Amino acid sequence: MKIGLVTPYVYPVPGGVNEHVRFLYENLRIRGHDVRIITSSHGLQRSSEGDVIRIGKGFSVPSNGSMGTITLSPRYVSQVQRVLDREHFDVLHFHEPFVPFLSLVVLRQSSSVNIATFHAYAGFSPAMELGKRTLSGYADRLHGRIAVSAAARHFADRFFPGDFKVIPNGVNVGRYRRAVPIARWQDGCPNVLFVGRLEDRKGLPHLLKAFRLIRKSGTEARLLVVGSGPQEREARRYVMTRGLHNVEFLGRVSDAEKAQLFKTADIFVSPATGRESFGIVLLEAMAAGTPIVCSDIHGYKGVVQRGRQGLLVPPHDAKGLASAISELLADPALRARMGAAGQERVEQFSWEHVTAKVESYYGFVIRRLAAQGQLPSGFSAPIPGAPAPIVVDREAGRP
């Protein structure tokens, strides 16, 4: 089949949705499909190249406690129609379909089978409340709906009720399994790792307070902070004024370096305060065999099993974080058991498994539409049969 993956965020700028799109693109191609990525332009990414098609220009805006993107173009309709007429997609797969405005324009003009994946989770959303009546017409054009977690499904279903298939995010298991620890930090001092954008919803201030409590108790440990963002200056000031000498800010790192850091860590901590639909970083930790301490929030409960792969702590609870981290620091055998349990569990989140589930869902939707005589005019591929079995190279964990 010819498949278009539509992302409202400027590809390949790093982010959870774009990471998802990237690996889904690669693995759908491995499974024999002809795939394109439809995105916007921004900065140095201005023109289409290879399988990446750019329409309009992306602008950064605050969204859900982080930064999002809206895409604008004075020639949207004609640009989109030209692309759709040229590419003849059988399936268009929209990621965050209601982020303005690229996905909405493509969806309105699509004559393909339209599938959407909902990635986000939030509490009350004024924008969605105001827009749901307008967007309901676009939602009616979706033939299939995927949510990356029960939390994401619950959030989307509040505004656009319907049938959702939960298919989780994936992780490149092999990259983290094969990574080599960084010798610089293999000096006998336990390493606690944080990876995330330095913004309010990721909860770094709570981890810094917890780490201060740990150090005041006399426990030896090092905190490695990966990421950048609006809270970086405040976080650095806190570390300096409290004399936390064993905290290192590493900024943004490459994918390869990130995998090495997960392999270097003795404990991974994700103290998110909420509004997380899933937690890909939790999968990355499990793939590396690193035990987890994380917030007890909706988006994380479907990934980490309490007491199996890690310990869950109420959000905003620095003392609880300190207690959980201290428990793992004091018990190497418990860390080893949780790390092994994580490596076992993460197999079901490998991109081979996830892509096979997505492909199977495409087939389910297409067969249902065909049986109802409602296949869109743009679909011209053979009707998929029963899904192929999932085969995973457990040693390599590819891709």
Locations of regions flagged by a protein language model:
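Conserved acidic donor-binding segment of nucleotide-sugar-dependent glycosyltransferases
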Residues: 306-307, 311-318, 327-333
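Carbohydrate-associated surface elements
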Residues: 41, 151, 170
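Nucleotide-activated donor-binding/catalytic signature segment of Leloir-type glycosyltransferases, i.e.
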Residues: 236-256
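Acidic anion/phosphate-binding donor-loop and adjacent secondary structure
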Residues: 47, 126, 154, 171-188
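N-terminal strand-loop element at the rim of the active site
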Residues: 7-13, 21, 25-74
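Acidic donor-binding loop of glycosyltransferase active sites
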Residues: 263-277, 290
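Conserved donor-binding/catalytic core segment of Leloir-type glycosyltransferases
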Residues: 183-212, 224
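Short hydrophobic beta-strand element within catalytic cores of glycosyltransferases
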Residues: 291-294, 304
